[in-house]
Amino acid sequence: MKSGRIHETDVANLKQLGEFIENTFKYNLVDEAGITTIPPLDCQEKEPTVLRTDDYETYFMNEAGTNKLMIKLNWVEKKKLNYLVLKEAIPFSQRVEKFKVCYEENGSMKECYNGTTIGYKKIIDLKGIQTDFLAIVIEDSRVAPVMSFVGVY
């Protein structure tokens, strides 16, 4: 007989998923990273550090006609990187059409991801790479890209 309640196995699985999400995305390693961009300032003279704030009130917007952007993160020492979270400032529309993620290993750059759209939120599995440098390279966008958040966990 059905009770209209969620089965206890499903409840346990949902709690486990909630704990995984909470623990995995608790501490953003970007908070302790140096962050630079090419171009170095956005069209409103804002520093790239605004990308640490996870909201739509702060964003980094390229000059009109500049459809490429590189976001560089560097740490003092190597970190184990599991996930990268990217967000576009959706109030300005989804703009990114092609991007890649690269990291430094033994003095050379290696590509660990390439994709098309970012949109509201893109979560990328970095598979636990060990590095002190990560670059997000927006290679093409419909119009100047507007990024609102970068997180590394």
Identify the role of each PLM range.
Residues G4, N74, D140:
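Short, flexible active-site loop motifs that bind/organize anionic cofactors or intermediates
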Residues K15-K79, K87-K98, F149-Y153:
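Disordered, acidic Ser/Thr/Pro-rich linker "stalks" and the adjacent N-terminal cap
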Residues D10, D31, D42, D54-D55, ...:
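Acidic-enriched, low-complexity/disordered segments with a strong bias for Aspartate over Glutamate
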Residues M1-A12:
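Aromatic/acidic polysaccharide-binding cleft in carbohydrate-active enzymes
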Residues A64-K68, K79, I90-Y153:
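Trp- and acidic/polar-enriched beta-sheet ligand-binding modules for extracellular glycan
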